[in-house]
């Protein structure tokens, strides 16, 4: 695959989970659910490398036949000048030129290729880390090797072959609601802690993959004294002394020294990945149990889509490897049991979930 127009895009995956124990940020796709879905739609494991496009336009040319899919923020996608839909597997010939332009709302979209693309890895992950200057950023002329050539999915009635799954794109509200659980320092804010859930907060331009700055009327810490630097989770809502909030995202350092008022849920982190500077958000307090059940529901919905995609792709001649036991989406999802960490907690309790109910894209 050759990059013709680069925009603001990188090769990434779900993150460097071996990194935090060694002092590295986890990084990875900021909208994890959209990244997982993109890989699922092309028959990959959810953990495979893919391209994250941030608020820009990217154009690439395929070197080999491929099955691709685009998810995340709404886009205009053209293949050889012909409009094509997102949220569905597309079978394309070698030499096809793909142009993807983010139209909004939303901030990030994901391009996955069946069999993935090759990029340099560190500690088992290709995720960029700006603090150490690691990662593959797209530039015009860059060649990204396609690891697999897909079979010919030619459709005699269409110039572009697609497998229609009827998935809907995520709805990005003008003022998203961000779910949070209580942070370890909530009691230090006394009665002012409730101010977090009152008026909205505005995303500042000085926001990136490390964290987002928000202005508004934040709570004020009532306990005097400094906070010693300690480990902080992805999603921590910190309250510094300058009347702003900091929401730490996947590029955050593993330690920090501000009080942590709240922690975003897994789903809320994906929502925050799609908000733009100047946009307003509102915080909503939820229990850890609610956050855990919501995470299971979303993972089961992804597993349901994976099974539909698997059947469709196999019928079209693709040979798909088994991902069970290694893929965070399929591992345990069939039984309704999810063992991946959820908002700092780990659980194997079953939960009754309708995988088609209120999935953000299905």
Give the ranges of each region predicted by the language model.
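Conserved "landmark" site that anchors the functional core of diverse proteins
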Residues: 1-362
């Amino acid at each position: 695959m050759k990059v013709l127009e680069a925009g603001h895009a990188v090769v990434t995956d779900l993150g460097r989970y071996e990194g935090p124990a060694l002092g590295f940020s986890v990084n990875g796709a900021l909208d994890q659910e959209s990244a997982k879905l993109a890989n699922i739609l092309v028959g990959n494991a959810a953990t495979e490398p893919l391209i994250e496009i941030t608020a820009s336009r990217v154009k690439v040319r395929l070197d080999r036949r491929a099955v691709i899919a685009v998810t995340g923020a709404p886009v205009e996608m053209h293949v050889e000048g012909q409009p094509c839909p997102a949220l569905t597997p597309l079978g394309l010939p070698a030499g096809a030129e793909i142009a993807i332009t983010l139209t909004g709302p939303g901030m990030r979209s994901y391009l996955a290729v069946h069999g993935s693309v090759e990029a340099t890895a560190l500690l088992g992950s290709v995720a960029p880390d700006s603090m150490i200057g690691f990662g593959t950023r797209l530039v015009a002329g860059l060649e990204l090797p396609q690891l697999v050539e897909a079979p010919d999915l030619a459709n005699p009635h269409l110039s572009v072959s697609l497998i229609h799954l009827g998935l809907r794109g995520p709805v990005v509200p003008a003022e998203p609601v961000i779910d949070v659980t209580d942070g370890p320092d909530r009691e230090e804010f006394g009665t002012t802690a409730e101010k977090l859930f009152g008026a909205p907060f505005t995303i500042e331009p000085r926001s990136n993959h490390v964290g987002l700055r928000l202005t508004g009327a934040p709570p004020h810490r009532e306990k005097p004294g400094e906070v010693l630097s300690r480990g902080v989770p992805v999603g921590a809502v910190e309250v510094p002394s300058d009347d702003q909030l900091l929401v730490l995202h996947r590029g955050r350092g593993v330690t920090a020294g501000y009080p942590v008022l709240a922690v975003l849920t897994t789903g809320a982190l994906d929502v925050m990945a799609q908000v733009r500077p100047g946009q307003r958000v509102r915080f909503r307090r939820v229990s850890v149990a609610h956050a855990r059940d919501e995470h299971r529901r979303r993972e089961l919905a992804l597993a349901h889509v994976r099974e539909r995609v698997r059947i469709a792709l196999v019928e079209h001649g693709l040979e798909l490897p088994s991902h069970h036991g290694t893929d965070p989406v399929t591992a345990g999802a069939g039984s309704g049991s999810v063992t991946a960490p959820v908002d700092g907690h780990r659980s194997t309790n079953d939960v009754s979930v309708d995988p088609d109910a209120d999935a953000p894209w299905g």
